[in-house]
Amino acid sequence: MTDARTRLSRFGSKLITFHPAPGANVNALIDVIPVIAALVLVSAIHGPRHGLIGMLGAMGGLSGKQSPPRTRLRILLGVGVVLMISQTIGISLSSFPVLLPAALGIWSFVMIFVWNALHLGPPGPLNVLFAAALASYYAAEGMTYADIMPATAASFLLAAATSMIVILVNPVRPARRAVSKAMEAVDLYANPEQDATPADLARLRSEAHNSVHAAWWILNDGVWPQDPRALGRPWMYRLWKRMSMAWEGLRADLLSAHITLTTTLHAQSFPSAEASDMRANVRYTPMGRPPWRYLLRTSLERGSRPLMVALRAATGVLVAAVAMEIVPFGRPYWAVLSVLIIVQMDFTRADMTVRAVLRVIGTSIGLQGYLAIMLVQPTPWMRIGIVAVALWTMNALIPRQYGIASIFITIFALIMLPISGEQQALTVAVARIEETVVGLVTAIGVIHVVGKRAPVLLVRSQYRRTLRSLMPVLRDLESGMSTTVTGMEHRNEMVHELIQASAVLSATRPDSPEILKNWSLVDRAVTEFGYDVLAHCWHLGDRPVRWARRISAEIALLLASLPPVSDQRVDPARVKSMVEEIHHQLPPMKAC
C-alpha cells in the first residue's frame, strides 16, 4: 500500500512539475521566425485561408533545427519531398476510409523508423506524419489538391529559405555549442574530483566520449566539401571562407580535447605502460556519423530502439484510425495526432503516461480558450496573429511544462481550421474532446501493452550489438589495418555502439527497475572492455598483433552461447563474468 501511495505521489508531482529551461524563450523565437514569415507571406499573396492551410508546410521548415547549415539543407530537401508524399497519401485516401488506417500506420512506421535510425534530430517526423492525417480531413471537407498542395509547398519553401537565412547569420552556432560541451566533458574526465570513485570515473568517461563523438558528428556533417569558387559566386566564396576559418578553429579545439580524452583513457587503462605520443595519430582521430547503411542495417535488427519506437507508433496510429472509423463521431486526424504526440517520443512508459494525462487536461482547457476566441468572431488576419502568438508560446512552454503547452497547441491547431460561426466551432470542440480521449486511451494502451516487453528486448539487443562491434576492430588490429579508412570506420561504429548501450540502459531502466537493476554491471564490464580495445588501437597504430584474433573468436563464442534476442531473462552476472574473462585476456600494453 505504501509503495502504491509513493508511486501515485511521484506520478502526481510529475503532473505539476515546472522544469527550468534557460534560453527557451529566445530559442522559441528563433524557431518560429521562419514559420511566421512563411505564414504572413503566403497569406499576403494568396489570402489568410491559404496561409493557414499551408501551416504544416511551414512547420516542416523547422526540421534539422539543431544541425549545421549543410546538414540542415539536406534534411530540409528530404522533408520537403516526404511532406508532399504525405499530403498526397492523405488526400488520395480520403475517399477510401477503409484503406486510410493501414496507410497511416505503414507511413508512420516508415517515417519514424528512418528518422530515428538516421538520428535526424528534433523536431522529429510529427509534422510530416500529421500532414497526411490533416490532408485527409481537408479533402473530406471538400478541398482539392489545388487548394492544399500549392499552399503547403509555398509555405515550406518560404519557411525553409528563411530558416537557412537565420542559421547563416551564425552558421557555426550548433557546432560551437557541441564543441564547447565536449571540451567541458573532457576536462571533467581528465581532471576529476579527488574523491571520485571508479564508478564516477566510468560515468565521466562515457559522458566525455559521448560528447566528443556527438561533436565530431556535427562538425564533420557540417563541413562544406569543396571550394565553391568554381561556381562563380563571390558571395558564396566569402561565406564559405568565413565558415571554413571558424570550422578550422573549432576542429583544432575538438581535436585537442579528443587527444586529451584518449591520453587520459590510455593512462587509466594501462597505467604501467609507457605513454604514447597521441599526436602522431591525429589524422586518425575524426569520427562522426556512422555510414547511413550501417545505421539502417543495425536498426532493422530485432530489439533495436528505432524499430521498437516505430512499431509502437505505427500500432497506435493504426488502432486509433480504425477506432475513429468505427465510432459514430469525429475524424481520424485529431486522434492520430493525439497518439503520435505521445508514442513517437523515446520516453519511458511513466513519462509517456504523464504526457498523455497532461495532453487531456491541456486539450480540455485549450478548447475552452478556442471557443472564447471564436465568440469574438476573429477576422482572418486576427487568426494569423493568434496562430503566431500560440506557436511561440507553445514552443517556449514545451521544455517547461507540457500540460500548459498543450493548451496553446490545441488553440494553434484549431485556429488553423477553416471554421466560421460559433455553432460550428462548438461542434468541432466537442468532436476534438472525443477524438482526444480515443487517441490518448489508445496511446496509453499501446504504451503499456506493446511496450511492456520493450526494455529487456532493447537492452539485450543493444549489448549484443555492442559486443559484436568490437569484432571488426579486433580483426583490424590483427591485420594491422587500424589506421586505414576502414579501420577508422569500424572504430567509429564501436564507439557509437558503446555510447548507445549506456543510453539505452539509462532510458529503459526506469520502466523495469527490478529486471534491469543488475545490467549496470554488464554495462560497466562492456564499456571497460571496449575502451581498453580503443586504447590498444591508439597505442598500436598499424602494427599487427596475433592475440586480437583470439579475442575476436572469444566474443563470437560468447554471443553464440547467449539465447536469441527476446524478452527471456538472461542472468546479467553470468554475462558480466564472461565479458570480464575475455577482457582479462587483453595483454598489458608493454606486452604488445
Located regions from the model:
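Pore- and pathway-forming membrane helices of multi-pass small-molecule/ion transporters and channels
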Residues: 3-13, 28-69, 76-84, 101-144, ...
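Cytosolic regulatory and coupling regions of membrane transport/channel systems
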Residues: 1-36, 40, 143-156, 160-334, ...
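Short, amphipathic, aromatic/basic-enriched membrane-interface segments that mark the entry/exit
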Residues: 15-27, 43-46, 66-76, 94-96, ...
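Alpha-helical transmembrane segments of multi-pass membrane proteins
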Residues: 56-57, 79-83, 317, 335-342, ...
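Membrane-helix interface segments
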Residues: 97-98, 144-145, 380-383, 529
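Core alpha-helical transmembrane segments of integral membrane proteins
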Residues: 295-389
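Hydrophobic alpha-helical segments that drive targeting, anchoring, or assembly
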Residues: 65-73, 89, 96, 226-232, ...
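Membrane-interfacial segments
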Residues: 45, 93, 97, 118-119, ...
